[in-house]
Swiss-Prot record:
GO terms for molecular function: sodium channel inhibitor activity; toxin activity. SMART domains: Knot1. This is Toxin To9. Has the structural arrangement of an alpha-helix connected to antiparallel beta-sheets by disulfide bonds (CS-alpha/beta). Pfam families: Toxin_3.
Length: 85
């Protein structure tokens, strides 16, 4: 089997698949969602954002999501800037 056939088959198998990522979902201003140790709140919030699941990460007391769509915004390295888009 030559390489071009192998590449074509691999491309067809991955076409239309959406990758997923994990992270802290954010609202305006790159601000994550505080959770106060409420896992149910975070799980609901994450699922509303099309994630597989979520929980309240006790170290930062912020919601953390598993399986967010690749297009979903997650917390970067910058500071929270409330009121900024």
């Amino acid at each position: 089997m030559n390489y071009s056939t192998l590449i074509a088959v691999a491309s067809l198998l991955t076409a239309g698949t959406e990758s997923k990522k994990d992270g802290y979902p954010v609202k305006e201003g790159d601000c994550a969602f505080p959770c106060g140790y409420d896992n149910e709140y975070c799980d609901k919030l994450c699922k509303e954002r099309k994630a597989d699941s979520g929980y309240c990460y006790w170290g930062n007391i912020l919601c953390y999501c598993y399986g967010l769509p690749d297009k979903a915004a997650i917390k970067g390295y910058g500071r929270c800037r409330p009121g900024k888009k």
